[in-house]
From Swiss-Prot:
Residues 48-453 are extracellular. The keyword Protein biosynthesis does not apply. The gene is Ly9. The keyword Magnesium does not apply. This is T-lymphocyte surface antigen Ly-9. Keywords: Adaptive immunity, Cell adhesion, Cell membrane, Disulfide bond, Glycoprotein, Immunity, Immunoglobulin domain, Innate immunity, Membrane, Phosphoprotein, Repeat, Signal, Transmembrane, Transmembrane helix. GO terms for cellular component: cell surface; plasma membrane. The modification Phosphotyrosine is found at Y601. Glycans are attached at N68, N120, N231, N284, N390, N412, N423, N434. Residues 1-47 form the signal peptide. Interacts with SH2D1A and INPP5D. Interacts (via phosphorylated cytoplasmic domain) with PTPN11; the interaction is blocked by SH2D1A. Self-ligand receptor of the signaling lymphocytic activation molecule (SLAM) family. SLAM receptors triggered by homo- or heterotypic cell-cell interactions are modulating the activation and differentiation of a wide variety of immune cells and thus are involved in the regulation and interconnection of both innate and adaptive immune response. Activities are controlled by presence or absence of small cytoplasmic adapter proteins, SH2D1A/SAP and/or SH2D1B/EAT-2. May participate in adhesion reactions between T lymphocytes and accessory cells by homophilic interaction. Disulfide bonds join C172-C242, C178-C222, C376-C445, C382-C426.
């Protein structure tokens, strides 16, 4: 080793002696200090040497290489290196020079002024580190060595049940394995069981245990650790994996039926003795352990709260299990184990709890009706909302064509058109209730016979309406005929008397005015002046034409004419309190040959109901037209006045 040091020293100092022209200042310039430091590292300068210090660091964390230098020591400089790399040069008062740029930002001097602090650790940082310490007034260099190990932080371990071996004594042997994700370097394990003295620190990740149904189902926990971290698993109860033990051949189990939302009791009918250790109820694979006060729970550390704690209880008298306010998830297998101090083989009783919902009223629907060759076919479907798969259906009248599908009952019905089809009743059943619904089949398929009956009934109704209408029409006509006869029998003068000039009137009364019962009034007569034969013949011809026109109009309207005076008619209408007058021009009632200047018209509205009528412009059954001819004011000779009679005025009452 001394020869090696001498060789490296000669190789380092040789070039300096071969260049006498270089001054001493040039030789010991600061630039040459760094190569000199590397040479000293390679030479392994003699000094005090100590065994390596092992340091553990967490991946991504930080470590401190502590030198533990006395405060009284005077340090010239410290060289830090990680062979074959030089890391840093540290001078007094925390002055540090980073020699490897790959460590920029990761290296700094700690609080004591000399120790090295490294952050953001990576896997490649693992290895050996050296510190060369040079003190003032000390000839030898002190070396200190460190060994750095980098570990990952452990994640939460998990317990895996690798195997379960059931036995005939209602017990199982379990093999548990504790696993941790990530690296497993230097990871050790330990196992604990709650409320027991089981504590294994052998470092094995495997545990083999045996447990009986009568043993308390206490949870197991696995703990894993390495030099930089530790973590524990969630507690695991292992009896839930012992499914084979509860399938042991015993006496036939009992089926108990419960109703959703109502209480149920699983009767054990057991009397405890001194030898009885405890009674364990198991639902599926969850253990329900009895407590002294009678409450039942699956885990003392996870007791249900509030009403849920009181929902499942065991009886203090016979250890029966009582469940209130049943839920659908309560259905399943239950096992009662009676454990004894004298025997390790407990007695067991099995129960099967079924939970059903009270059925609602079923609904019956029909498919579109299909008709072919006089055969009517339809499919009726009966279903219950929320009934589940345990619902059965029956049809009344009994039918053999019902088919169950997806919780519904489908009934195929076919019959000939016109055949009487009864109403169908669908009844839904389950073990705790039943409910029925009736479907009326009277209108689902109407055949020709039913259509014939329908049209016949409709025809009879129409005939009845026609008879009633005819009866009222005949009655009305009879009343009108009676009125016409009464007016025909009224007294009519043999010849129409002449009235003075400007006062001749002719009245027309409608046969519809049954209420207008006015007797004919005798008109006042005035002597008619004599005239010559030509004038009389002309007047007679004009009068005959006027009578013919008026009788023709009256006959076309089926009216009766009567000759009364204008004053008498007005007096009669005024007496009834039903008269209104309005000047109108009935163009469709008066001959157009008459001079408009010589005619005046009034409208008399008659309300046969006794109410005050409104003036009407349109002709109706309550209107009486009265026409009065004005006397012409033409100059006539005395002879013409004596011979020509005045053209009579007339009134038309309709």
């Amino acid at each position: 080793m001394a020869d090696l040091k001498r060789y490296w020293c000669d190789w380092a100092l040789g070039p300096l002696s071969e260049n006498p022209r270089m001054s001493q200042q040039q030789i010991f310039s600061p630039i040459l200090w760094i190569p000199l430091l590397f040479l000293l590292m390679g030479l392994g300068a003699s000094g005090k040497e100590t065994p390596p210090t092992v340091i553990s660091g967490m991946l991504g964390g930080s470590v401190t290489f502590s030198l533990n230098i006395s405060k009284d020591a005077e340090i010239e400089h410290i060289i830090w290196n990680c062979p074959p790399k030089a890391l840093a040069l540290v001078f007094y008062k925390k002055d540090i020079t980073i020699l490897d740029k790959g460590y920029n930002g990761r290296l700094k001097v700690s609080e004591d002024g000399y120790s090295l602090y490294m952050s953001n650790l990576t896997k490649s940082d693992s290895g050996s580190y050296h510190a060369q310490i040079n003190q003032k007034n000390v000839i030898l260099t002190t070396n200190k060595e460190f060994t750095l190990h980098i570990y990952e932080k452990l994640q939460k371990p998990q317990i895996i049940v690798e195997s379960v071996t059931p036995s005939d004594t209602d017990s199982c042997t379990f093999t548990l394995i504790c696993t941790v994700k990530g690296t497993k370097d230097s990871v050790q394990y330990s196992w604990t069981r709650e409320d027991t003295h089981l504590n294994t620190y052998d470092g094995s990740h495997t545990l083999r245990v045996s447990q009986s149904v009568c043993d308390p189902d206490l949870p197991y926990t696995c703990k894993a650790w390495n030099p930089v971290s530790q973590n524990s698993s969630q507690p695991v109860r292992i009896w839930q994996f012992c499914t084979g033990a509860s399938r042991r051949k015993t006496a036939a189990g009992k089926t108990v039926v419960g109703i959703l939302g109502e209480p149920v009791t699983l009767p054990l009918e057991f009397r405890a003795t001194r030898a009885t250790k405890n009674v364990v109820w198991v639902f599926n694979t969850s253990v329900i352990s009895q407590e002294r006060r009678g409450a039942a729970t699956a885990d003392s550390r996870r007791k249900p709260k509030g009403s849920e704690e009181r929902r499942v209880r065991t009886s203090d008298q016979d250890q029966s299990l009582k469940i209130s306010q049943l839920k659908m998830e309560d259905a399943g297998p239950y096992h009662a184990y009676v454990c004894s101090e004298a025997s390790r083989d407990p007695s067991v009783r099995h129960f099967t709890l079924l939970v059903y919902k009270r059925l609602e009223k079923p609904s019956v629907t029909k498919s579109p009706v299909h008709m072919m060759n006089g055969i009517c076919e339809v499919v009726l479907t009966c279903s219950v909302d929320g009934g589940g798969n345990n619902v059965t259906y029956t049809w009344m009248p009994l039918q053999n064509k019902a088919v169950m599908s997806q919780g519904k009952s489908h009934l195929n019905v076919s019959w000939e058109s016109g055949e009487h089809l009864p109403n169908f009743t669908c009844t839904a059943h389950n073990p705790v209730s039943n409910s029925s619904s009736q479907f009326s089949s009277g209108t689902i398929c109407s055949g020709p016979e039913r259509n014939k009956r329908f049209w016949l009934l409709l025809l009879l109704v129409l005939l009845l309406l026609m008879l009633i209408g005819g009866y009222f029409i005949l009655r009305k006509k009879k009343q009108c005929s009676s009125l016409a006869t009464r007016y025909r029998q009224a007294e009519v003068p043999a010849e129409i008397p002449e009235t003075p000039t400007g006062h001749g009137q002719f009245s027309v009364l409608s046969q519809r005015y049954e209420k207008l019962d006015m007797s004919a009034k005798t008109t006042r007569h005035q002597p008619t002046p004599t005239s010559d034969t030509s004038s009389e013949s002309s007047a007679t011809t004009e009068e005959d034409d006027e009578k013919t026109r008026m009788h023709s109009t009256a006959n076309s309207r089926n009216q009766v004419y009567d000759l009364v005076t204008h004053q008498d008619i007005a007096h009669a209408l005024a007496y009834e309190g039903q008269v209104e007058y309005e000047a109108i021009t009935p163009y469709d009632k008066v001959d157009g040959s008459m001079d408009e200047e010589d005619m005046a018209y009034i409208q008399v509205s008659l309300n046969v109901q006794g109410e005050t009528p409104l003036p009407q412009k349109k002709e109706d059954s309550n209107t009486i037209y009265c026409s009065v001819q004005k006397p012409k004011k033409t100059a006539q000779t005395p002879q013409q006045d004596a011979e020509s009679p005045e053209t009579p005025t007339y009134e038309n009452f309709t």
